[in-house]
């Protein structure tokens, strides 16, 4: 399958990534991506950016080198109540927010606690995507989370990076994907790139989705406008006109 969108990418601003914003945009353009999301880690990530970085996206272009740019954040869930490490004032300015659990920002809890964190964060209207929920460090009740995502119109990410960096993720990712297929929940495939050469490349996630027969209509990033329409329907991207 050809993917035209990558919403989960990091720059050197995240502290442990290796390429700049412009290098990422150039690579996205080179490989034919139509939409690129820059979603650096929230400020509670060691080495991550401060809030001024996220509050200053107004200086950034909307399009560059033929690529539509989404300026967002992979925000850290910092408690089981679903609080994020960026305030509402910042959240409402962003084009896209991925909410993720990272063990350097919150201790892994019980299955019930981890599930509660994800259920609660989906009550936040600014959250668009749940990041890498197949991480075995944070066991969850996958079906409860997937059903809640459908109710709240939140996208479930299938994170290609998890297949390599989070050992044991493949089985859980497949379970999550099958549940999304069963309940007709939209998914988005993300590279979680920390260097530009990973952008737009989802081989392991794509192979798994082919294996389970994931319907293409449930995959948001196989067309340019699906993600843009999704975000505009949530009241975002007011400055962007869709052709």
From Swiss-Prot:
Stored InterPro entries: Phosphatase_YcdX_put, PHP_dom, PHP_phosphatase, Pol/His_phosphatase_N, Pol/histidinol_Pase-like
| SMART domains to which the protein is assigned, alphabetical | POLIIIAc
Q: Please report the organism this UniProt entry assigns to the protein.
A: Clostridium botulinum (strain Langeland / NCTC 10281 / Type F)
Residues binding Zn(2+) 1, per UniProt = 8, 10, 74, 192
Q: What is this protein called?
A: Probable phosphatase CLI_3563
Q: Where are the transmembrane segments?
A: none
The uppermost taxa in this organism's lineage are: Bacteria, Bacillati, Bacillota, Clostridia, Eubacteriales
Q: Which family does it belong to?
A: Belongs to the PHP family.
Q: What is its EC number?
A: 3.1.3.-
Q: Where does Zn(2+) 3 bind?
A: 74, 102, 132
